[in-house]
Curated annotation (Swiss-Prot):
Transmembrane segments: none annotated. InterPro entries: ATP_PFK, PfpB_PPi_PFK, Phosphofructokinase_dom, PKF_sf. Its cofactor is Mg(2+). Its EC number is 2.7.1.90. This is Pyrophosphate--fructose 6-phosphate 1-phosphotransferase subunit beta.
Amino acid sequence: MAAATLSLLNNGELASSVKSPGTGRYAAVYSEVQNSRLDHPLPLPSVLGSPFKVVDGPPSSAAGHPEEIAKLFPSLYGQPCVSLVPDDSGDVAMNQILKIGVVLSGGQAPGGHNVISGIFDYLQTHCKGSTMYGFRGGPAGVMKGKYVVLTPEFIYPYRNQGGFDMICSGRDKIETPEQFKQAEETAKKLDLDGLVVIGGDDSNTNACLLAENFRSKNLKTRVIGCPKTIDGDLKSKEVPTSFGFDTACKIYAEMIGNVMIDARSTGKYYHFVRLMGRAASHITLECALQTHPNVTLIGEEVFAKKLTLKNVTDYIADVVCKRAESGYNYGVILIPEGLIDFIPEVQQLIAELNEILAHDVVDEAGVWKKKLTPQCLELFELLPLAIQEQLLLERDPHGNVQVAKIETEKMLIQMVETELDQRKQKGAYNAQFKGQSHFFGYEGRCGLPSNFDSTYCYALGYGAGSLLQSGKTGLISSVGNLAAPVEEWTVGGTALTALMDVERRHGKFKPVIKKAMVELEGAPFKKFASKREEWALNNRYINPGPIQFVGPVANKVNHTLLLELGVDA
């Protein structure tokens, strides 16, 4: 078993009381759990623990519109995906002295620090004398040349720790000619051999654009991506999961499990829990598989079935009524953050409101409503008053409705309450309904990474280092065979262009890495669908408890990944 070695101080002693310079992290004031994680050994795939070589696969294509992707990436399109394989020839080029940069891009996800640690340790082991720069504050740090030189002492307090505060992240993009020029100047100034971009689909799209730009300018700087997002929507056959998803789902599942026990204890509340996931519903689906709630809404299914908001409300109300017949006046309902974006009629209403409010003032008499189509007017009148006001009053700087600020869980509580009141009047429901709302979001982004995420991220970083040393660019670090023991994991790089499609924006084709949505024919959804009726009417609640770092379930992997890999979870 190849294992990570702990970073040492110059005197050979562990940096247990070291403050990471300029960041404020003191390992000396960590909790016992945090300190135990600092020294947690990280096994590596066996291919990374012995001499290896990088082998090219066949030429790659694109996820969609290959002819357009080829035009947008003339230097990179078609390059092969690569694999690391053992090499006993003795020809492996070691101890190159490299200058490598790393940048965190986008929202936080547990495990990011271990990606950085993996890159650093690879350089320390295989490229002695190399320098690693951490760009501060995300892509803006690359453009402005703001960085810190990473050292063993600097990195040590962050090993196996949550957060992105080692160098911090940002949501800036390198996309205009001026911004590309700034990035070029930084790369030249630091004489960078490589740059690792740790981010989600947008960030890795930008990483590919940067790799194309550097190659077209004959810069030696190579660019490698690493797949990050708790939403779980950056994945493919070659990139089985994005890091952070495993940890975030386990954190949310613990909280949901606690709420379930509370619901059962009081016997009088329905808990409506909104979960992160602006686009795909992967987090909601995984948390359902881990906890067995009474109702779980999956945005992709709502869209596929063309369900209306009234349909969704009626479905929840039906479950509430049926449970009341069994004496259960409580329950737990999971809602994906992006639910509204999957309901076509809501999108139509928002589009009409944006158009009307761009030219008219909302009058108290409601004359403006006459400009809504009959279907949208009916939907608007169906919404709770608080949501109506939110749609009309809370606008972004462009005057558009701020959909992300709509508290879907509170909206559904009010709509279900109204529906149940109507059923009471008809004698179809005679119990009491009380709703409690929750949003579990930021709580999951910076937790201590699970054993899986800690190890997976370390391997991603180590793999990224190997790809850069091998002269590769425009790839995303890929670690596979994740259902097997760590030693049997595969390591390689997937062509970023192979993950891309195009969208038409402002009359031009723009490259995008396609988000991986919940597949209704996929194994995770099918397993959920086969169980949900039983979960709805009975109490099959599971409280998984906190993330375990030792013991029989410490290395357990999330259901979604195992089911997608063909392993029964």
